Amino acid sequence: MNPGRLPPRLLAAVAFGGAAVLLTGLWFGPVLVRRTDRVGWLLYVGLPGLAAAVSGAVFGRPLAHPRGPANGGRAFLRGAGIALAALFLFAPLYATMVKVTEPGWTSVAGLTILVLEFGGLALGWELVLVGGLAGWGLHRWARRASPPGGA
């Protein structure tokens, strides 16, 4: 696949969205497989993937279309930052969807704060690690796939 043919934002969205779906699917999948409701899959796998894809599309262009000298450390840090941005996007999305699908929840803002706190505590280190690896991998792949001399 030639990264020059696909928009860099699309490549970043697919890379980070795929990494998020993989991480959350492995984390929550064993529990969700036993349940038959689709809302659980949406809340715990779909929304994190969507949030990561949007964050990747917004902030990941430099990883998918690298310019200048290669720097894997910066790519890792950018990827980790994209993962954290995805958490900040996911929290209000999750809180809103819970309010819509589960009657009785009254405060989207309060649930957003809870999701940020517990999401950061439970999965924060994994988000940073997986996001950093996704950023580093995307940067490395784009460097190898782009023609010599950059563009």
List each model region and its residues.
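Juxtamembrane/disordered regions of integral membrane proteins
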Residues: 1-151
